Amino acid sequence: MKEYKLFLAGEWTDTETGKIIDDKNPADGSLVAKVHTAGPKEVETAITAAVNAQPAWAALLPEQREKVLLKAADHMEANLEYYAQLLIDESGSAFMKAMDEVAQTVNIVRAAAGECRRIDGGIVPDDNAGELSYWIRQPLGLVAGISPFNYPLLLCANKVFFGLAAGNSFILKPASDTPISGIIIAECLEAGELPKGLFSCLPGPGSIVGDALVEDERIKKITFTGSTAVGSSIAEKAAKTLKKYHLEMGGKNPAIVLKDANIDKAVETCLFGAYFHQGQICMATSRIIVEEEIYDEFTEKMLERVKNLKMGDPHDPMTIVGPLINANQCEFIDEQIKDAVSKGATLLTGGTHEGAFYAPTLLKDVTQEMNIFYEESFGPITSIIKAKDSEDALRLCNDNSYGLSSALITNDLSKALSMAPRMESGMVHINDSTVMGSRRAPFGGVKKSGTGREDGPFSIDEFTELKWITIRYEDKQFPPM
């Protein structure tokens, strides 16, 4: 049985004040590995080492930091299939999703490496005569990241590698359900010969590791992906030390399908957005708002496709829907369905589960009286909602406290370009899925979906602060004092 030690300040060590936990496969409950978790002593060791190591790292030339990150990416790419198998075993990711996640993570690491050379500054056209005025970007210092279980490797990397690229040191607390994904990051950084002390991976409970990182004044920023409830708690605690924070939280993402859309293409787009990775994606399409003229035809074709989705062993390359992260999530979805059906919704297919496997589920006639209209589901379920026209569709789209991603499917690009700015989400994708990513675009939401933006130069913005510098080269006459 594999046993993973803590990666503490660049060294693999046994835990002293934490525990050794069982990391289990959500598909069958089998033991994947034993994992050492951090306690108070390990957190303190990691913070002290990271604070001490950061100035030398920040002082390196950009190409020196870039070299370390590129070597880490090469190591990950060389072990792509092995790491994908770990993702399948630990998180229940289907084979297709796991392979894609590792490949995309390699791209993220290389994108972060490229940003090392792009961290810029600028000249200020100052109105003070005899003075040169300019600004620079500087690293924050020590940054901590708290990552989720759904895209555990990719979202760990998106935090860690951009943070390091900007010249910071970094402490990662991976999700308790997927600690090995954080350990993979540590293995890659070790292969890249990252200097000792700069990075620690600290699996462990949020109440011990997470709270300690959020509340410690030596940590200058928290970057978090997860639930809105936990993110709000982090913001509250971080405010006590005036700590910066970046929060990427929940979503109840709508796809609007207008009456002029290609229905077959709209179904394909919504099917992917709703059921890829069992719907356990913050951007998952969980509300499909369809104009009434095509509502019945769209629903019929969507139902046919959902019924044919293959659920089963995530190691099987043909599997589309694997297990949820744990069986508790199944019970939450059951309650959503029960409430919706009692208020007039129709359960077209699914609504059953065995262990952590939840059958692909489709509801129609969902309305604003139902909890599922507003609540994130985080499972293989989506709702079809009828709209009278495009303006009604927009109203239904915006009636939610979340605002992460949205889609608009139509052949009328003039109408699409008019509607997109009025859709209350951080990202709008016209004729594409709500599930979209880019290494250069600003990823993030509005409302209760979060604060800040990440990816590419926007991540560098999050991990640096600006400093204004002036140089006086002519005498200045001050007022008489």
What would you call each of these model-derived segments?
Residues 28-34, 219, 256, 310-311, ...:
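Conserved C-terminal structural/oligomerization subdomain of aldehyde/semialdehyde dehydrogenase
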Residues 1-27:
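Hydrophobic face of amphipathic alpha-helices that form TPR/SEL1-like repeat modules
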Residues 229-367, 396, 430, 478-479:
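ALDH superfamily catalytic-core signature
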Residues 54, 58, 73-80, 84, ...:
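Structural signal for hydrophobic packing residues in well-ordered secondary-structure cores
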Residues 32-119, 130:
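Glycine-rich loop-to-alpha-helix module at the N-terminal edge of alpha/beta enzyme cores
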Residues 31-38, 53-59, 145, 255-258, ...:
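Short, well-ordered beta-strand elements within core beta-sheets of diverse protein domains
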Residues 29, 65, 87, 109, ...:
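Residue-level signal for inorganic ion chemistry
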Residues 121-265, 387:
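Rossmann-like NAD(P) dinucleotide-binding subdomain of oxidoreductase/dehydrogenase enzymes
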